[in-house]
Amino acid sequence: MLNFFAAAPKGFEYSLAQELTEFGATEIKESVAGVYFTAPLALAYRITLWTRLASRIVLVIYKGSCESAEQLYNAAYCIDWPAHFSNRNTFSIDFHGTGGFINNTQFGALKIKDAIVDRFRDDGDERPNVSRTDADFKVDAHFRNGVITIAMNFSGPSLHQRGYRSTTGEAPLKENLAANMLVRSGWQAAPTTLLDPFCGSGTVLIEAALMAADIAPGLQRNRFGFEHWRRHDKAVWQDIVAEAKARASLGVKRCEIKFYGSDIDSRLVALAKRNAENAGVLELIEFKVANALNIEPPAAEGYLITNPPYGERLGNVSELLQLYYQLGDKFKKEFGGWKVAMLCSDIELISSLKLKADKQMKMFNGALECAFNLYTLHANSTRRDTPVLPEGVDIADIAPAFANRIKKNAKQLEKWAQKEGIDSYRIYDADIPEYNVAVDKYLDYVIVQEYMAPATIPEAVTKRRLSDVLLALPAAIGINPNKIIMKTRERQKGTNQYQKLDERKLELITTEYGAKFKLNLTGYLDTGLFLDHRLTRRLVGQKAKGRRVLNLFSYTGSASVHAALGGAKSVTTVDMSNTYINWAKDNFALNGLQGKQYEFVQADCLQWIRDCNEQFDLIFIDPPTFSNSKRMEDSFDVQRDHVNLLGALVKLLSPTGELVFSNNKRKFKMDIETLTKMNIMVKNIDDITLPMDYKRNPHIHNTWLITHA
């Protein structure tokens, strides 16, 4: 008997152990991402050819404790390597695991390589050569918790590569993951009509057809790891392959199961057909181009097993939520008697089906953790958490309280915004605590920002509420789902003020009291314009005429633009970020503002204040609540440091000058007593700077007018 380890993705262990048991393997023991087993050589060949779930099978040659580099070398040296492969073959070592004396995998691989080469030399042979890319004989080594396992890669290249896939779609599904979906759904145990309405390149259907037609998944592979192993029994292997070929030929002819696949992308459907033809099962599968929402059940009962689009794969989140909701509605109404199995990484999306799951499992699509849910659709199937919606009822009724509130807000604020001369404003700000989001309208786009929920609320609850918000929004405010952008916001905790999201850009031009500003709705957590400072910016513009204006922590320079348009004698704009300084320059150009009187400075604002010896008539500063950027000499906390900051700023203020100080710290407390002793006059001006669209949540808005006493 030989000892083996069958590796597989996390979450496959139970299914793989069951498969190995059915093959006849013994001493089966589940481990992390794989299963140990023993088998005679002939059975090991059969498992390698027929396993639908394993990614790799290795023959364990040595396993023992290892506490030093010397022990590692000795463990590898004691193996009779010339009995396993010829020095005319190339070899490689794939080393996994670190800890203790092994700081990196390269060190471990090098020690084993040295031992192998030395063993060949000491046995009187020339040393074999190492090949890093395409070795004949591959050694697998794993070091964990002081134990070293040295093995031979018995199966060769990853077993999920069956050989039938020509190219992939945008979001390919690995073949062994598709097989595990079929196993865990219960379909493999009782094959029946199978439908995949998001078939992509056809992987789920092809794997199912291979099962139903008794075709070995490894039959089309042209390379295995044991081929250069000196103990390889070629005759036994050829007999097993010949038997598999005979079974496949007979299985296709006898298969009576019907398979149906569709996808909205004609290119993918054509690819699926090519893959099915390569796999020898095209005659068993009916493919067509179709929208999943338009498909009809091809039989009275069957299985619908699919891997629909989700956030990490394809598409806009709000559009996908609508899709999932509509799918759930279609399943409920038209697929009574069917079983549904669905793979999805987003709790929000899968909860939008509004169907009660019989079983919920976890699977990994690569490194991505996914939910794999099973549903039984009865003739009178009901939705979970919501009443069954009669025909014609608005989808916003999923979250009626939220939908009604935001609909009312949007209607009131639209008239106000037109009157004010603005086209970007907030229409909802956690008005209802259960729906803990902010919703901002930017022209004909909407950004939904999810606030971090209290730790006491289960994640599943917050995810479901968020999905309900995104489902209800389009109908409630009359917006296309593809113009809804989702972001997650947390209260600032020791990080920098601005957070970059990705490289994508969705740029718009917004208008505010006659000023124009460039927005980037997707590149950063913030868009380039703080909407709650709208009236503060206008106030700066109203006070700027003929004055020398300084804007610190300027962000994208929007207050500077208002000052310049207001007739400022000069405007100095300072920010630490070169990105935002350039953005500020773009905003000036957008408004036709140019000239030497407009200065842009990229600098650490706190250091710049200390170094500055100029005087200004109007200063606007909106510092971060907290910042510890590597580019700043010191950390900054607005509550802790505001007295010192304002004390330094009034030294730059002309005798009749004014300083507008703003921040967004919750429960900020101005130290008026200390500032008064410093001959600094302080007046809160929240009442004239808090916009109407933010009056529902005034706690984060602090604005002060400061002058010399």
From Swiss-Prot:
Catalytic activity: guanosine(2445) in 23S rRNA + S-adenosyl-L-methionine = N(2)-methylguanosine(2445) in 23S rRNA + S-adenosyl-L-homocysteine + H(+); guanosine(2069) in 23S rRNA + S-adenosyl-L-methionine = N(2)-methylguanosine(2069) in 23S rRNA + S-adenosyl-L-homocysteine + H(+)
Major localization listed first in the record, in broad terms: cytoplasm
Location of this chain's protein in the cell: Cytoplasm
GO MF annotations in UniProt: 23S rRNA (guanine(2445)-N(2))-methyltransferase activity; RNA binding; rRNA (guanine-N7-)-methyltransferase activity
SMART domains (alphabetical): THUMP (SM00981)
SUPFAM superfamilies in UniProt: S-adenosyl-L-methionine-dependent methyltransferases
One Pfam assignment: RlmL_1st
Biological role: Specifically methylates the guanine in position 2445 (m2G2445) and the guanine in position 2069 (m7G2069) of 23S rRNA.
Family: Belongs to the methyltransferase superfamily. RlmKL family.
HAMAP family: 23SrRNA_methyltr_KL
Protein name: Ribosomal RNA large subunit methyltransferase K/L
